[in-house]
């Protein structure tokens, strides 16, 4: 996990040295979104496997806790960006909202699993799917 964070930060630092301000922000958005999308998908998979009785509650809870930390790291990394044009400001607001939505869904799952409430965790599956889809679109920005 720390290695992935270090790689992500190094990538952002390297990308910050080249390109226009809008391109730099798109690259940072894409990197953060890809990282968060992975964690959201991990959370979704944990809930689905728990529902199918292929995973223990305790293991699922730990997986989701780790995923929540990953989403928080991605969101924090992106929120440190400084948009400098109207275009980059709009992108910043959109990406920040999408990351916040993902973080909210993953946190809701963690809380539900901590309360041994699989039904409440399952209610987050549509939000997790939508977040993964939205983050995937953002993740394609720098490609």
What are these regions (language model features)?
Residues 109, 113-120:
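Short helix-adjacent coil turns
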Residues 13-17:
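C-terminal motif of bacterial Sec signal peptides marking the signal peptidase cleavage site
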Residues 28-107, 123-127, 131-138:
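Alpha-helical segments in soluble extracytoplasmic regions
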Residues 9-10, 33:
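Enrichment for repetitive, rod-forming helical segments
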Residues 18-23:
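Bacterial signal peptide processing site
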Residues 113, 142-143:
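Short, solvent-exposed mixed-charge patches
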Residues 1-8:
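Bacterial N-terminal signal peptides that target proteins for export
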């Amino acid at each position: 996990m720390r290695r992935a964070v270090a790689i992500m930060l190094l990538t952002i630092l390297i990308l910050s040295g080249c390109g226009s301000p809008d391109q730099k922000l798109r690259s940072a958005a894409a990197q953060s979104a890809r990282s968060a999308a992975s964690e959201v998908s991990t959370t979704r998979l944990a809930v689905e496997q728990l529902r199918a009785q292929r995973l223990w509650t305790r293991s699922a809870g730990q997986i989701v806790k780790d995923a929540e930390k990953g989403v928080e790291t991605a969101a924090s990394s992106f929120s440190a960006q400084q948009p400098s044009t109207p275009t980059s400001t709009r992108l910043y607001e959109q990406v920040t909202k999408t990351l916040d939505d993902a973080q909210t869904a993953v946190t809701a799952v963690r809380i539900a699993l901590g309360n041994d409430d699989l039904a409440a965790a399952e209610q987050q599956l549509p939000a997790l799917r939508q977040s993964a889809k939205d983050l995937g679109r953002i993740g394609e920005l720098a490609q």
